[in-house]
């Protein structure tokens, strides 16, 4: 996601990661609303087999410059190369519809600007993958949904997602994804057969 324009340029002091106030609020919006748009950026059951603690994909609602366990990265760049600055939201997978994904990501960032959200401190030095659930709670670090079912319900309850996509598309996606999740829950996989049939 690139922010452009005189007010949105990312060119503050290095202490601020060269993020303007507007950029920080945009990033705060991404972090706040990521759980609500996860059903769009990660739309299938198997998407959540990638979004697991200790995996390569980030699930923790935090940000940093080089910490691979955070949801958003703000890679460094040379002071004279402001155009190279960017925010990297690292959770979307290739199955996402790019039009819907960009719509909800932009809406989340713009909501952060409109709500004047304060950006949390970056998490540079901690390997969040190594923290227990209790540690995460104590530090106030939330996570993305753990399943498609959880993601769909957060999406269904989101006023921002409904306003962004419109009632018709929002309701259709909720119904379709709930049906997909219900089908999956009733399916007995080969792994379950191999694991449990012999001990019954």
Residue ranges of predicted features:
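Catalytic-core signal marking the mid-to-C-terminal active-site face
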Residues: 12-200
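Single conserved hydrophobic/aromatic residue that forms the stacking wall/gate
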Residues: 1-10
